[in-house]
Regions:
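Short S/T/G/P-rich N-terminal loop/turn motif that feeds into the first structured element of a domain
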Residues: 1-53, 60-70, 74, 82-125
């Protein structure tokens, strides 16, 4: 796949890479709940000046955020990533120890980052 066929998706610090046409289809329901459990209260998307697709998600709580991320580790939870042709995924936010272990089993490069005390994100080993 040529690099020009990819666009970046940023979700409050998270970065996804995927095929732009598939991502556009995925985002057609923008403004509704992020997932079927409604873990996020709101999401919206736009194209930035440097041609990146920006997604913002607002969660009710850390528990809602964790529920959203844990959904990726369920059976067939990675289907959206495979559908979009993602080459890598970076997830930034509070994560649990079991998520760190599950991320190692994902069928594509999946990196977890956590908040550092100074507000930056640091990669989890």
């Amino acid at each position: 796949m040529a690099k020009s066929d990819l666009i970046h998706v940023q979700v409050e610090g998270n970065v996804f890479e995927g095929k732009s046409d598939e991502l556009a289809k995925f985002l057609e329901n923008g403004g509704k709940a992020v997932d079927s459990q409604g873990h996020a209260d709101l999401w919206q998307w736009s194209i930035s000046s440097d041609n990146k697709l920006i997604i913002n998600e607002i969660f009710r709580s850390n528990e809602a955020w964790l529920g959203h991320i844990k959904g990726w580790f369920q059976q067939n939870g990675d289907e959206v990533f495979k559908m979009c042709g993602f080459e890598r995924v970076q997830v930034c936010g509070p994560v649990s120890d079991d998520m760190k272990e599950m991320a190692k089993e994902m069928p594509f490069p999946f990196e977890l980052y956590d908040h550092l005390h100074d507000g930056r994100f640091g990669k989890l080993k």
